[in-house]
Amino acid sequence: MTAYKIDHIGVAVVSIDDALPVYRALGLEERRREEVPSQKVVTAFLPAGESSIELLEPMSEDSPVARFLMKRGPGIHHICFAVRDIEAAVRDLAGKGFRLINARPAPGAHGKKVVFLHPDSGHGVLIELSEDAS
């Protein structure tokens, strides 16, 4: 398994609309906004070179992002790495003893399959893997 690029950096926000002005001031523009019911969030992607910033707004108080915001406030939520074969990545990481939040890929933004490594395995960083089979 090889993570071949940083796909995006997820930023938890209370409101995407309230967060956009600072990113627009940096020259970034929102490309796509969508609801991701499996994660209970609305996402907005702002391309930045070969990567993107993903703004994450909770859809409900019981979403993982809402809990993150209540505990830590707005800020960097996760780093996402692109992988070609997410099933192989899950087997490889689990076989090496890393703790996965979801051992089965779930639907993420843009319909991509995603898994998350627990922050305990990522030295305090929530790591997302997203399958990009292209």
List PLM regions with ranges.
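An N-terminal domain-start capping segment
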Residues: 14-28
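N-terminal beta-strand motif that seeds the catalytic metal site of vicinal oxygen chelate
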Residues: 1-18, 74-83, 133-134
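Long, charged/polar, surface-exposed segments that mediate recognition or autoinhibition
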Residues: 72-73, 86-91
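A cross-kingdom feature marking solvent-exposed beta-strand/loop segments within repeated
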Residues: 5-7, 26, 30-41, 59-77, ...
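Vicinal oxygen chelate
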Residues: 44-49, 53-54, 81, 90-134
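Short, structured motif recognition centered on aromatic/hydrophobic residues
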Residues: 6-13, 23, 46, 53-56, ...
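Short, charged/polar surface micro-motifs in flexible loops or helix N-caps
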Residues: 50-53, 60-62, 86
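Hydrophobic side chains in well-ordered alpha-helices
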Residues: 19-22, 89-93
